[in-house]
């Protein structure tokens, strides 16, 4: 992590102000190289640079190198990144999708990755970098840590939870069967999904989307791996069975309302989420036979 921060500074900041006297730096001096990065479309990089530069200047204030922090006034100067919308299939196309998935003849590990993505609807990095020691097979639980040990040479492999706190994912019996199958393949390794040619690395970030393309889908307009989260969110909401808090907790979404966020955080909704992920798996299974809406499937179970 430290080397990555230094690399960003060397690339984008030092060429502009690296030789400057820190006591002479103004907000505009700090902001100029960061805005240049922002204007190039690298909004996330620009946001991280702003955070790092602000932290460095804060350290300088705390250690009496400068009297005040000129970086504090950079707030609000960068583009706000719009939420990205990922393509996802409507529930009416679930039977078609599940039939294509059943007919998929690629690697078994890849098929399992697609199915687990669909059943758990976690983020791509949360699944790709998963370790076997995160799973409790007796309780059918997956504990995704806030941060993982970095895999040398694998970009972003330190990623655990996006919200920087442990996330407990209850697992359906269908997901547990897949994990048992996967254990026959990679159970002797640390990672669930080791790389093709090097078991110390992980499967490519494009694996799930490549499988979807092999199944005949356009991952830019029809469905992509991240779109499974949208598909699950839509069906769970349409069923009318589950509270928004439980759904949002399962998706590990952040809550902008601080009071509500504190409530959701302290209340894991684990019992409801256990029932919910099992309902989702059963609903998908039902759609392998014929299409039924989430609402109608929910009514049959009440």
Where are these regions (language model features)?
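C-terminal catalytic core of Y-nucleophile DNA break-rejoin enzymes
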Residues: 83, 87, 151-180, 189-211, ...
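N-terminal DNA-binding module of tyrosine recombinases/phage integrases
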Residues: 1-22, 267, 271, 275-281, ...
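Hydrophobic (often cysteine-bearing) scaffold residues that line and stabilize catalytic clefts
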Residues: 1, 5, 9, 26, ...
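Conserved tyrosine-mediated DNA breakage-rejoining catalytic core shared by Y-recombinases
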Residues: 72-79, 129-184, 255-258
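Short, basic (Lys/Arg/His-rich) helix/loop patches that form interaction surfaces
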Residues: 99-111, 120, 181-200, 206-249, ...
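Basic/aromatic-enriched alpha-helical hairpins
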Residues: 1-40, 56-59, 258
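Catalytic-site neighborhood detector that most strongly recognizes the C-terminal catalytic loop/helix
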Residues: 80, 88, 144-152, 176, ...
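Basic, Lys/Arg- and aromatic-enriched nucleic-acid-binding interface segment
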Residues: 37-52, 62-130, 138, 148-150, ...
